[in-house]
Amino acid sequence: MQEFDLTRRCVAEALGTGLLVAAVVGSGIMADALTADDALALVANTIATGAILVVLVTILGPLSGAHFNPAVSLVFALSGRLTRRDCAAYVIAQVAGAIAGTALAHLMFDLPPLDMSMKVRTGPAQWLSEGVAAFGLVATILAGIRFHREAVPWLVGLYITAAYWFTASTSFANPAVALARSFTNTFSGIRPGDLPGFVIAELLGAVCALALMRWLLQPARPIIRQTSPETAP
């Protein structure tokens, strides 16, 4: 794969994270406007998020790796796949892109660019959900890269689609996305004061996934037969 310079990779990370957040926030606004049924609105939000992830990881993965997520970049840095400098640059790009994505979604629906959320998302169940969501996402990515690299876009999109429904938090699983969603007082928002719990849980879940997958994906050492002097040729 061709190596792209850091500037291009950071632009790809900002663009991908921004479009991801625009899809999450925008589809939430659209769904909330079209139906009073929260379950139906979540279905719409889920489909849009899963679909855009498949597209973004496919088209931008060869450019930057398509992290779009500080937790993923941290894991890649800890595993030696990304330098500390590049990790810091990726995170800055992801956060900037994510906030821009919220503003873009708002402008498309004729709302103020940024509007602090008042939606409460806190408590042990929510934090556990975010830890599980991030754990599963990172495990999916690492195992996907190890065994089926070409399937990673679909694996990520399908995992997040499922995690929207089996986690109480609807699977943010991404500190940059969580921060950006604190700037929208709409269906997908999160109160700024609830961010620390989410971010800490996401980072812990990601690091735990790295620790487990490092061991799990390590093949067993081959058995070397020792030849005795009597049986040696």
Curated annotation (Swiss-Prot):
Residues spanning the membrane: 11-31, 40-60, 89-109, 125-145, 152-172, 193-213
One annotated Gene Ontology cellular component of this protein: plasma membrane
Motif NPA 1, residue range(s) on this chain: 69-71
Disrupted-gene phenotype: Disruption of the gene results in increased tolerance to arsenite but not arsenate. Does not affect sensitivity to antimonate [Sb(V)].
GO BP terms, alphabetized: response to arsenic-containing substance
Membrane topology: Multi-pass membrane protein
Subcellular location: Cell inner membrane
Top-rank lineage group of the source organism: Bacteria
InterPro entries noted in UniProt: Aquaporin-like, Aquaporin_transptr, MIP
Outcome (variant: V177I): Decreases methylarsenite transport activity and results in higher resistance to methylarsenite. Slight decrease in methylarsenate transport activity
UniProt motif (NPA 2) ranges: 174-176
GO molecular function (one): channel activity
Broad class of where this protein is predominantly found: membrane
Keyword annotations from UniProtKB, A to Z: Arsenical resistance, Cell inner membrane, Cell membrane, Membrane, Transmembrane, Transmembrane helix, Transport
Functional summary from the UniProt entry: Involved in resistance to arsenic. Facilitates efflux of arsenite [As(III)]. Arsenate [As(V)] enters the cell through phosphate transport systems and is reduced to arsenite by the arsenate reductase ArsC. Internally generated arsenite flows out of the cell by downhill movement through AqpS. Can also transport the highly toxic methylarsenite [MAs(III)] and the relatively non-toxic methylarsenate [MAs(V)]. May be a component of an methylarsenite resistance pathway in which methylarsenite enters cells via AqpS, is oxidized by ArsH to methylarsenate, which exits the cells via AqpS.
Free-text note regarding domains: Aquaporins contain two tandem repeats each containing three membrane-spanning domains and a pore-forming loop with the signature motif Asn-Pro-Ala (NPA).
Family: Belongs to the MIP/aquaporin (TC 1.A.8) family. NIP (TC 1.A.8.12) subfamily.
Protein's UniProt name: Aquaglyceroporin AqpS
Annotated organism of origin: Rhizobium meliloti (strain 1021)
